[in-house]
């Protein structure tokens, strides 16, 4: 349960139709195996104690009595199990038969939830036997000493070790309807929905089922466990595939191979779900819990080993097709944002500083797209290259080639002499390569860009990316400042893919060659003199790998996770790539710089938001510039 993770399982025992004795023996074995594998929430299919396909045998008292007796037997047999288990059965109460899910924990039947929506169409004819369940809870006598609450408005909460875990139940058809019970469950506080199902298999139904479960988990910001009937059910008219699904907020974490009765496992991140709900004020505004009852279940505190995939590049889709689509979309957002700003200001000239590095390259590509959308000539893009003390031949030549290939107007201003004069004016020794030496060059370049823009009634286009802004890796009032920053919410790991996508799709071989070489060039501000003609100042040697910092940024900003949890996730994501000492070193650097450099982000120029994470002080990050990082650093100091 550490860090809010809970391991769950969807189980499909092979049933024998109308044999509760054999079925409960098999359920016990399957549940015990799932628990042995660490599952703490275990879900079995709809009516699994009897089998779903009993037909008119559901009207036989012998079957109903046996199902009830075997439920009690199963609860006792699983008494020592450290888990909460959900099983399905038919249950008579006050003259009506209900299709129910029973929750078992520590030898007790802690609650019963009836099915709300009873299908009676096509191959389904449940209304022949079952009645819709009531919302309000009422007591049901299952057996002596087993007086159990039953109702659809019941939630089960893990009070002791993981209070964020609140479970709501729906049964099969319930989720296929326009108004699933899980909606009101979630608004009443349920963070995990379990669905005991018997969904038969027809061509293409698995795709719809998967999207339905994933979509419901996204809509409700919850985890969702879907356990469906499989092999063993009657095939008189239909076939059941045992299609089990575990989803979390729109993402399928685990899914069984159909027709195998496979148990699937995953860990659901309850803290992540609670974080999402905390941020979405409209979710809380719709909450309603006054008519719900909560019953506690208990599991022992334990450390959950993570088997779920942790993406080392959360900003970048792993699938090439999805990645290309994302890149196309982001370039469109960036260029449309700039297009609107140029239209509003009636600027027909843009000024971009071109270094031959990734960020300025992307900014120029976006500016070109904006001008093309406006049907303005590219010659009105003033691409300014400003060689300084650290400029290498490679970046200089790439800058010139890039400008030429894109058809922008080249302006070259060598800043070395102007900076030397400035150093003399302020008494700076040129041989002392300190922060003044570096920032003096950055501010000189910004001054040149601003003045060229003023001279030509133009707009300075900012090049800095979100990763640099998160770390404060920008000169205040130097490259930090512009009139519109097109890269302001694009992380460095994504910048690389955007440029690569453009190179792959532009259809210009010469331009592609230049872009590929830019991609191959080490990231550097080039403010220190080169060594033997090569870049001496490499950003990632100084502040750390951007793939780590983007990973940290994502989980800090997107979910507000604590350092310990982010460290744990990074260990999983970067296993075999970075050792723990390296991950921890740069995690410290990230937090220290993220807090100390907020003053730079507090006065950022406008720029378009492209993803769920952004650092604009007017939108996503309203953080005080003088906040203390102490408690975060204290937590990091205790990590190993």
Model-flagged regions — what are they?
Residues 1-351, 369-378, 410:
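Enzyme catalytic cores with a strong preference for nitrogen-chemistry domains
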Residues 163-165, 222, 234, 248, ...:
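ATP/NTP-dependent adenylation/nucleotidyl-transfer catalytic domains that generate, transfer
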């Amino acid at each position: 349960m550490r860090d809010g993770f809970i391991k769950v399982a969807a189980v499909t025992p092979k049933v024998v139709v109308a044999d509760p004795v054999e079925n409960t023996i098999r359920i016990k074995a399957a549940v015990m195996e799932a628990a042995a594998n660490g599952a703490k929430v275990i879900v079995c299919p709809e009516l699994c104690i009897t089998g779903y396909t009993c037909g008119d045998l559901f009207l036989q008292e012998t079957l109903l009595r046996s199902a009830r007796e075997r439920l009690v037997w199963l609860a006792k047999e699983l008494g020592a199990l450290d888990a909460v288990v959900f099983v399905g059965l038919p249950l008579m109460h006050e003259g009506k038969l209900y299709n129910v899910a029973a929750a078992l924990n520590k030898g007790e039947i802690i609650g019963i939830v009836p099915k709300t929506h009873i299908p009676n169409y096509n191959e389904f004819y449940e209304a022949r036997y079952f009645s819709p369940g009531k919302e309000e809870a009422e007591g049901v006598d299952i057996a002596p000493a087993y007086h159990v609450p039953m109702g659809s408005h019941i939630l089960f909460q893990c009070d002791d070790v993981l209070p964020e875990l609140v479970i709501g139940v729906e049964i099969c058809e319930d989720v296929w309807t326009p108004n699933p019970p899980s909606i009101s469950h979630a608004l009443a506080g349920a963070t995990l929905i379990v669905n005991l199902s018997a969904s038969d298999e027809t061509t293409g139904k698995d795709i719809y089922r998967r999207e339905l479960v994933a979509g419901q988990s996204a809509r409700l910001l919850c985890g969702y466990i879907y356990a469906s009937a499989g092999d063993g059910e009657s095939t008189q008219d239909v076939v059941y595939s045992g299609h089990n699904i575990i989803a979390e907020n729109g993402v399928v974490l685990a899914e069984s191979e159909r027709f195998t009765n496979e148990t699937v496992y995953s860990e659901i991140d309850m803290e992540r779900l609670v974080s999402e709900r905390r941020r979405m004020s409209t979710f809380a505004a719709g909450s309603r819990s006054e008519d719900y009852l909560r019953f506690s279940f208990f599991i022992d505190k334990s450390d959950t080993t993570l088997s779920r995939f942790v993406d080392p590049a959360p900003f970048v889709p792993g699938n090439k097709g999805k990645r290309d689509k994302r890149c196309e979309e982001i370039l469109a957002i960036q260029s449309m944002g700039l297009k609107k700003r140029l239209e509003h200001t009636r600027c027909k000239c843009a000024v971009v500083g071109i270094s031959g590095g990734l960020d300025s390259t992307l900014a120029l590509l976006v500016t070109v797209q904006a001008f093309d959308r406006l049907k303005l000539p590219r010659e009105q893009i003033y691409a300014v290259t400003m060689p300084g003390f650290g400029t290498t031949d490679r970046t200089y030549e790439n800058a010139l080639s890039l400008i030429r290939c894109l058809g922008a107007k080249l302006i070259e201003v060598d800043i070395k002499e102007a900076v030397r004069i400035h150093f003399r004016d302020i008494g700076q020794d040129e041989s002392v390569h300190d922060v003044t030496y570096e920032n003096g060059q950055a501010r000189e370049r910004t001054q040149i860009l601003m003045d060229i823009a003023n001279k030509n009634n133009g707009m300075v286009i900012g090049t800095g990316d979100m990763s640099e802004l998160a770390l404060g890796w920008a000169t205040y009032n130097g490259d930090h400042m512009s009139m519109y920053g097109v890269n302001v919410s694009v992380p460095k790991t994504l910048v690389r893919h955007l440029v690569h996508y453009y190179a792959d799709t532009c259809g210009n071989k010469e331009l592609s060659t230049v872009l590929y070489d830019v991609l191959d060039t080490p990231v550097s501000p080039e403010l220190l003199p080169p060594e033997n003609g090569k870049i001496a100042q490499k950003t990632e040697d100084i502040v750390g790998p951007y793939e780590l910092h983007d990973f940290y940024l994502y989980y800090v900003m997107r979910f507000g996770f604590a350092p310990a949890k982010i460290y744990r996730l990074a260990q999983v994501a970067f296993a075999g790539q970075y050792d723990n000492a390296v991950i921890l070193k740069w995690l410290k650097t990230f937090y220290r710089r993220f807090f100390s450099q907020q003053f730079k982000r507090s006065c950022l120029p406008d720029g378009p938001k492209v993803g769920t994470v952004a650092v604009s002080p007017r939108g996503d990050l309203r953080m005080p510039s003088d906040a203390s990082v102490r408690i975060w650093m204290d937590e990091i100091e205790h990590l190993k």
